[in-house]
């Protein structure tokens, strides 16, 4: 069984201001197929929930779900998604905590 990377994550509050939400709405990485669908699902989830759950752990749990959802895709698609996820986390103001391979 794989070790859960969130096990060692130190939770912290995130300061979500309108500018962060605007940048999340505007983020449109060059993805396709399952990677694009999963990125869009994650982006919607964050936009709908991050103000109620403004914590690093909650965000990383959502990102982890996206990473796991595309685990069966080809390496190039996964790499492009991982790059987009890191950009998304930079907008939010946190790192990946080891969730993104």
Ranges and model annotations:
Residues 39, 43-70:
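Mature extracytoplasmic domains of secretory-pathway proteins
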Residues 34, 38, 55-62, 77-84:
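Residue-level detector of well-ordered alpha-helical segments, enriched
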Residues 19, 71-72:
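A very general structural signal that marks isolated residues within well-ordered alpha-helical segments
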Residues 29, 72-75:
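Long, contiguous binding/interaction regions
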Residues 32, 54, 93-97:
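Residue-level signal for secondary-structure boundary elements
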Residues 1-48:
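Short terminal alpha-helical segments
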Residues 3-4, 74-101:
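Amphipathic alpha-helical binding modules
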């Amino acid at each position: 069984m794989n070790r859960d990377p969130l096990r060692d994550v130190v939770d912290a509050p995130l300061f979500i201001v309108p500018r962060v939400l605007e940048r999340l709405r505007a983020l449109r990485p060059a993805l396709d197929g399952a990677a694009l669908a999963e990125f869009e699902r994650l982006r919607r989830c964050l936009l709908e929930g991050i103000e109620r759950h403004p914590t690093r752990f909650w965000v990383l749990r959502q990102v982890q779900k996206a990473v796991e959802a595309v685990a069966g895709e080809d390496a190039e698609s996964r790499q492009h998604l991982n790059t987009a996820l890191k950009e998304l986390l930079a907008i939010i103001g946190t790192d990946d905590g080891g969730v993104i391979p």
